[in-house]
């Protein structure tokens, strides 16, 4: 299977969107993305998937835009040009003497803007496909070169006639007016913890004291408070959640005085902070000396970038090798992790 579509929803309703997409009568796999309100669909081909969407449109309540994907590449201007050339050559008989527009939806941080890329690609197509007698028309075009960028990944399609993105206006209207849930849907951070609880339920059994490092805005603390008698949420930032058993230590983790601020044996340590890998690990290890024997640590390794992920993991593992009573139980790539993240489950022996 390959990426065949991006499907958008109102941010916060990704779990509901995933559930309804999973019910579609087609072989597929639904993936989370690092971007709120966007899921990626893997299947056999985008044309078949789009037809299935149209046939089952009335059963979809959380799908807003369905964007078919024909070809993927790295987010590099030259790679994008190659992918577009491939598609144009494949469809050139249908594109002769037509007008076109280039549209880019860019998500993430890049050295170029969406508008700059649209201009670069437009000029490239005109220069390299003169034999097709193409012309640019920003409003009344015959086909659209559509570029969807998700940080390091880019997806290109040529929309024409019936093959086009599908916008479900009724759902946009309904979701806009939808009353908020009494308890809001899970965000990506909470989905990570939910997945951990489902995969490793024994870690969360009979726990009294949890220390959650870098807790703000409180997603992990909220979920842990339902399993533990007490959660110490360590962060200078505000918590967006409240529970009688959540104790907010409003300090930087490195400034916490354990005897004064906690002073009890820890059953579980969690850390999902946005810090450099080694810096974050040393904070976890600071509290590990107060972790009970056979207690677990859940630590998110956040690499500096995708290219340094292996190097950052090796650095963290080297640091851990000096702590003989802290053993690696599992290194896992959760569905809700970003591409730069790995989840380390450690155990004190």
Curated annotation (Swiss-Prot):
Record Gene3D superfamilies: 3.30.2130.30, Vaccinia Virus protein VP39
Organism encoding this protein: Methanocaldococcus jannaschii (strain ATCC 43067 / DSM 2661 / JAL-1 / JCM 10045 / NBRC 100440) (Methanococcus jannaschii)
Protein name as it appears in the record: Uncharacterized protein MJ1257
Membrane spanning residue stretches: none
Cited InterPro entries: RNA_MeTrfase_FtsJ_dom, SAM-dependent_MTases_sf, THUMP_dom, tRNA_sulfurtransferase_ThiI
Gene Ontology molecular functions: methyltransferase activity; RNA binding
Coiled-coil spans in chain: none
One cellular component term from this protein's GO annotations in UniProt: cytosol
Ranges of residues in domain THUMP: 51-160
Biological process per Gene Ontology, one example term: tRNA 4-thiouridine biosynthesis
A Pfam match: THUMP
